[in-house]
Design a protein with these regions (language model features):
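Conserved donor-binding/catalytic core segment of Leloir-type glycosyltransferases
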Residues: 185-205, 211-216
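Membrane-proximal helix-turn-helix segments that form the acceptor-binding/catalytic region
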Residues: 70-78, 115, 128-158
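Short alpha-helical segment that forms part of, or immediately flanks, the ligand-binding pocket
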Residues: 246, 265-273, 284-288
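A short alpha->beta transition loop at the rim of the catalytic pocket in nucleotide-sugar-dependent
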Residues: 253, 275
Length: 315
C-alpha cells in the first residue's frame, strides 16, 4: 500500500518476480502505473527451490539470505544513473549497500524485521541464558552482511514499517504504518478449551516457555506448523498437531506466541480480527489492541502468570 500510494508514472519498479503472472500470492505486487517493471524471475525461482530443499532451519535461513543477495545483484542492473531516490526492501538492503549502488541516492527502507545486529544480539542473550535451547544458536549471518545493513540503515533517509519495535529503533526517521488487518470473521459461540500455538515449534518462537506453562497449568495445546525442536519436544503433554491450512483458529480459546523475534504477525492479526484473545511477546510489533496481551518478557514464569486466569476458566 505504501508504494502504491506514492508511485508516479515515471517510476521504475524492480521486483523478484511478477506474482500475479506466476500465481505466487507472496509476490503479487501491483505493477500497473509504472514506467517500467524489472524482475529477477529465474533467479528468484531457482533460489526459492534451493531454500525449500533445505530441511535444517539454519541451512534454510542461510539459503534465504543467499537468495536475497542473488536477487539484489540482478535487480541492481536496472538502476540507471538518473534514479536518485529508492524505496528498498530490507531483505535486499545489505547487498545493495555492499555493491555501492545506494551511494548518492535518497533511500527509504521498507522494514519487516529487526536489524540483523539487534536480532542476533537478542538470540545471543537468550542462548547464553538458556544453553539447553540449542536452536537459539542455530545460525548467525556473516559479520560483513550485518555491518552492511547497519551502515545502510544509518544512511537511510526514512524507515517505513508497521512494526512497533522496529519504529522505536529509529526515532525521528520512522514512519509507522498500520498493520493490514484481515477481514473480520467472527466465530460462532461454542465451548473452546485449547490454546493455539502458531509455531513453528522452536525456541525463538517461545515453544519452551509455552511447554512449561502447559505443564504447570494443565493446558491443551494446538500446535500449528512444523516441530523444529525434535519429535519428542511435546511428549507427555496434552497436545494436538494441526495443519497450518486447517480451520484451527475456530478451535482456539486463545492464541499464544511468546516469541523472542517476530517478523510477520499475520496469524496474530487474523486471531484479533476474529475476536480471539492473543498473548504475545513485544516482538509481535502490534500496537495496543482489544484482545491483545503483550508480555513484559517471554520467560515461562511471566507466561504462566498471564495464562493463569484463562486456564482457570478453561478448566
Amino acid at each position: 500500500a505504501y508504494v502504491r500510494e506514492r508511485k508516479s508514472r515515471a517510476d521504475l519498479m524492480a521486483i523478484p518476480l511478477d506474482g500475479k503472472r506466476w500465481n505466487r500470492p507472496r509476490y503479487a505486487w501491483e505493477t500497473e502505473g509504472f514506467a517500467a517493471v524489472a524482475a529477477a524471475t529465474p533467479t528468484t525461482l531457482w533460489h526459492a527451490f534451493r531454500a525449500r530443499a533445505e530441511t535444517a532451519q539454519n541451512r534454510r535461513v542461510a539459503a534465504q539470505l543467499l537468495r536475497s543477495k542473488a536477487i539484489a545483484e540482478k535487480l541492481a542492473k536496472a538502476l540507471t544513473p538518473d534514479v536518485t531516490e529508492l524505496c528498498v526492501a530490507q531483505s535486499l538492503l545489505p547487498f545493495l549497500w555492499r555493491m555501492g549502488v545506494l551511494g548518492g541516492r535518497r533511500v527509504t527502507v521498507l522494514m519487516t524485521r529487526l536489524p540483523m545486529a539487534e536480532l542476533q544480539a537478542r538470540l545471543d542473550a537468550a542462548a547464553h541464558a538458556h544453553p539447553d535451547r540449542a536452536t537459539l544458536a542455530d545460525f548467525r549471518a556473516p559479520a560483513a552482511w550485518v555491518a552492511a545493513e547497519d551502515e545502510a540503515l544509518a544512511a537511510a533517509e526514512r524507515i517505513v514499517t508497521p512494526h512497533l519495535e522496529i519504529a522505536a529503533l529509529f526515532p525521528g526517521r520512522a514512519e509507522r504504518l498500520d498493520w493490514q488487518m484481515p477481514k473480520a470473521s467472527l466465530r460462532a459461540e461454542k465451548p473452546r478449551r485449547a490454546i493455539a500455538f502458531p509455531g513453528p515449534s522452536i525456541a525463538r518462537k517461545g515453544a519452551h516457555a509455552l511447554r512449561e506453562a502447559a505443564l504447570a497449568l494443565d493446558l491443551e495445546i494446538l500446535v500449528v506448523g512444523q516441530d523444529l525442536e525434535g519429535g519428542d519436544f511435546w511428549q507427555g503433554l496434552n497436545v494436538r498437531s494441526v495443519a497450518r491450512d486447517s480451520n484451527w483458529l475456530d478451535e482456539a480459546a486463545a492464541v499464544v506466541q511468546p516469541s523472542l523475534i517476530e517478523e510477520q504477525p499475520r496469524v496474530l492479526l487474523a486471531a484479533l480480527a476474529a475476536g480471539v484473545p492473543v498473548i504475545a511477546g513485544r516482538s509481535c510489533g502490534i500496537a495496543p489492541h482489544i484482545g491483545l496481551t503483550v508480555l513484559d518478557d517471554c520467560e515461562p514464569a511471566t507466561l504462566i502468570h498471564s495464562l493463569a486466569g484463562l486456564a482457570h476458566r478453561l478448566h
